[in-house]
Amino acid sequence: MPRKPRQLPAQNTLPYLLLTLTALCGEYPIRQISHLPGGSAYLESVVTALRRDGLLRTFSKDGLRGLRLTSSAKRLLLADAPEWFSAYLTGSSEPNKLKSEIPRRLRLHRMAEILTIMHNADIPAFPWEKAPFSAASQSAAIPAYYTSREVKEIGPQGAKIKSSRATGILLTDGGIFLTYNTAKAQMKWEYKAELRFKALLQTEGVMPDAEISGIVFGSTMEQLSILTQPDAHSYFLLDGSFPHFYYLTNDRYGEAILRLLCDTQQRRTLDAILADGLHEGIPNWRVENDAIDSEGNPVLFAYTCDFPRIQRFDTALELHGMTGTLICFDYQEEALREICGQCVMLQSIDFQQFERSVLYS
């Protein structure tokens, strides 16, 4: 039987982090625990201890399992940091008034997954770690991630994006990224709502000169082929509304790409390594490219998995009867082979070597 909790774990510990993520989202997916920092045995012991101490409980229904705060945990968190948690653990806020319907719970799980990967990538994502969204244009602190809930708090304008499937937006030195999470399922996109979200960012003056792109997270690389199929609901992914849309997996691979998208200088470093032995790219050529090989064929650096750009490269090669090389990470190669035609040759980078020599060097 769980104890009656008397105190919280210390801040800046993994147990407190898990309680924080659960408080902000309402329900934390069991399957996501393995993505938190730490070994599997330690993570299991943390969850067991929080349950035993009466701070977390398991909620399971319709095959979907998650962790929820107990009433005692809410009380202790509010006493510990009211300025952090009052907006989430009081009144009629969704994390405080949880529902059991599968669509609502899945949305909470998707939000939790994105908050976790942002935290793992050292991107400020908790409300108290950054300026309010209404003041984001005056803040120099980037990168920063804002949940869709934070964006909607700007006032009446926020109602225009009510139907959007975006989990939030990521502000970086390279631009703004509307962020989505399809998880294991095929997402039903809301075309008009997503374009309204983009228009809202353009009119609200958040980084007014920044390019607006998209990131969609999924569970595996195999889901990429589904996203690139011509479908009425996902048409905006490839119709040019967003010239750049990146597919990232919800794991350490996706975390690494996320770090690259937030760090222009590190991308330049990797590009310079990949360009060694190649000729300089040709701007505004008939085939989009980052470099030219010794035979005069275009080369595209595709390690960020910008799938509209990859599709444009593939289509242009076929249209002009040319061949070209697409450079990606080894874990992306099989999925990219599936969506590219015979004109594209794939060349892969060893991801583990990249981690050791570039990402964390």
Question: Which residues are covered by each model-predicted region?
Answer:
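Short, amphipathic alpha-helical interaction segments positioned at domain boundaries
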Residues: 72-105
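A short, conserved structural fragment
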Residues: 51-62
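Exposed, interaction-prone assembly regions rather than primary DNA-binding/catalytic cores
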Residues: 95-190
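Short, Lys/Arg-enriched N-terminal segment that forms or immediately precedes the first helix
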Residues: 1-7
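Long, compositionally biased intrinsically disordered regions
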Residues: 179-187, 199-361
